C-alpha cells in the first residue's frame, strides 16, 4: 500500500500557483503485511503444485499458524518463527535412474524483498557438487528473482539443471528400488512440542516406541513437553503417526530436519545428535515436579549441538 503525499517546497518567494513536488511514502507496517500475505499465497500455490505425499512438507507448522494469525490481525507483532518447508522432487538423472532432490526453504520475515534461504540436497551429490549447485542456484535467484516470490522458479531451475551436477560414475552406478528406496535415504530429526506430558502411560509409550523403531533422541515430560526423535525417515513418520493418535490437548511438529545420506549404517550414526533415546527430567529446585528448568534444557541441547532449536520452541534465546 502506497500513500501519495503532495509536498510544496518551502520558499518565502514561492507561489502556491506553481507546480508541486510529489514524494511516495510507503508505510512500513503495510509492507510487512504485504510480505506476509505474499508468503502465505506462495505456500498455498506450492501446496497445489506439489500435492503428493511427502512432496511438500511444512517443517514448522507453528510458524505458518503465526503467519496466518498476524495477517488476520494486520500486525506482525508476536511473530517469532520463519516459515520453513521442504520440497521433495524425484528427478531423472539419467535414462535409467531417478533420484530425490530436496529443497529446504526458509522464508525470512522480509521475503520476497530479500531472497529465501534455500538448500538443495541429494544422496547422489558429493559435498563439492552440492556446494556448487547451491552456489549456482543462489546466483540465478539473485539475477532473475530479487524482489519477487521465487520458490517455483527455484524448483524449475533445479529440475532443469540438477542432473548436470551428478557425476557420470554416480549416475551410472546400479541401484534398486529407485523412488521407493529414496525415502529411506533420508535421515530425519523431529522436534515435537506438546502442551504438556504428564501421563505415565504416554511417557512409557514414547520410550517403548522409540526403542522399537531404533530411534535416538529424548523426551522431556512436564509443561510444556518436548520430544525429539531421529533416525530413518520412515521410522520417524511411524513414531509420529502413533504419537499423534493419543489424546493430547495440543501436539505438533515444531521443527523437522531432513538430511539425505548414503543409506549406510556408518553414515546414519554420524548424522545422529543423540546416541540413545532417554527421558530427561530437568527439575527446578523448590518448584513443583511438573515444571522443568529450561536453563538446564538449553545447556543439554547445546552439548548436543542443537542449541538453536531452543529459540524455535520457545521464541526466546536460551541462557
Curated annotation (Swiss-Prot):
InterPro entries (alphabetical): Phi-like, Prp3_C, RWD_dom, UBQ-conjugating_enzyme/RWD
Domain RWD: 41-165
PTM annotation (Phosphoserine): residues: 275
UniProt keyword Amino-acid biosynthesis present: no
Keywords: Phosphoprotein
PROSITE patterns linked to this entry: RWD
Regions that span the bilayer: none
Extent of the signal sequence: none
Protein name as catalogued: RWD domain-containing protein 2B
Gene: RWDD2B
